[in-house]
Curated annotation (Swiss-Prot):
Protein family (similarity comment): Belongs to the pantothenate synthetase family.
Active site: 37
Keyword Ligase: yes
Protein EC: 6.3.2.1
Note: The reaction proceeds by a bi uni uni bi ping pong mechanism.
Chief site of localization: cytoplasm
NCBIfam families, A to Z: panC (TIGR00018)
Name of the protein in its database record: Pantothenate synthetase
GO BP annotation list: pantothenate biosynthetic process
GO cellular component: cytosol
Gene name of the encoded protein: panC
């Protein structure tokens, strides 16, 4: 695996691979990679002949009081993990390489509606930062396909909409969330948790499972199920940011006759914000 740090080197390496008739797969990351990221790269390697990954902690998607400065940067370990997962090329640019004129004058990409609410409500500007950097990376790499984790469910929906609305010839593949044995979704931010918080953390996914089970049994009072879930989270030591049942594609609030739903949540354990979601398909009842 080669590592490049400039757009020029990146484009030259991708052009060589494309010249050999190779299909290009792409996995954008912020580094501090874990098994969940490795699964994304493995999926890309299954679907493409040449896999590009990027490691870039994107300042544009962090709010003023968020964890940009303390977000872990572990490039050497990331390189090892990428090699093992089947990556061919790593793009690890500086902020100056990505935003040469500074971020204040950077053209922005905004995906309306899907970016609002849920994480967008408590992290204003976050999805604009995500859409902008992913758009730039797509233009730099020009992949045939890109793989994203379903753990960041709203982000995946935003990127799918951007690709569709801007007519990008890129196949977007969602990869199921990778979990620890106790159910906690793998996340770079799990490293912030104290041992006690780590023990409590799986309650987030259990709460989603509880709500999904209720819906599966035919309950349609989503507000009552969510109220139960919020009580469960608070009892486990969480400060919930949001917990909602949404339509799985449009992310609008769920309606009684919706078949494809997602139970989606963000909650704080101490200062660490964890997110998770659970998709479910509701079978139509036959008389």
């Amino acid at each position: 695996m080669n590592t490049v740090k400039t757009v020029r080197e990146l484009r030259a390496a991708v052009a060589r691979a494309r010249g050999e008739g190779k299909r290009i797969g792409f996995v954008p990351t912020m580094g501090n990679l874990h098994s969940g990221h490795a699964a994304l790269v493995t999926k890309a390697a299954q679907r493409a002949d040449f896999v590009v990954a990027s490691v870039f902690v994107n300042p544009l998607q962090f709010g003023a009081n968020e964890d940009l400065d303390k977000y872990p940067r572990t490039l050497a370990a990331d390189q090892e993990r990428l090699v093992q997962a089947g990556c061919n090329l790593l793009f690890a640019p500086t902020v100056e390489e990505m935003y040469p004129d500074g971020m204040s004058v950077q053209t922005r990409v905004s995906v309306p509606q899907l970016s609002e609410g849920l994480c967008g409500a408590s992290r204003p500007g976050h999805f604009e930062g995500v859409a902008t950097v992913v758009n730039k990376l797509f233009n730099m790499v020009q992949p045939d396909l890109a793989v994203f984790g379903e753990k960041d469910y709203q982000q995946l929906a935003v990127i799918r909409a951007m690709v569709r609305d801007l007519n990008m010839p890129i196949q977007i593949i969602g990869e199921p969330t990778v979990r620890a044995e106790d159910g906690l979704a793998l996340s770079s931010r799990n490293g912030y948790l104290t041992p006690e918080q780590r023990t409590a953390a799986p309650a987030l996914y259990r709460t989603l499972q509880h709500i999904a089970a209720g819906i599966g049994r035919g309950q349609r009072d989503f507000a009552a199920l969510v109220a139960e879930g919020l009580a469960q989270l608070s009892a486990a030591g969480f400060r919930p940011d949001y917990l909602e049942v949404r339509h799985a594609v449009s992310l609008r609030p769920a309606m009684i006759d919706d078949r494809d739903l997602v139970v989606i949540a963000a909650a704080y354990l101490g200062n660490t914000r964890l997110i998770d979601n659970l998709y479910l398909h509701v079978e139509e009842k036959t008389a």
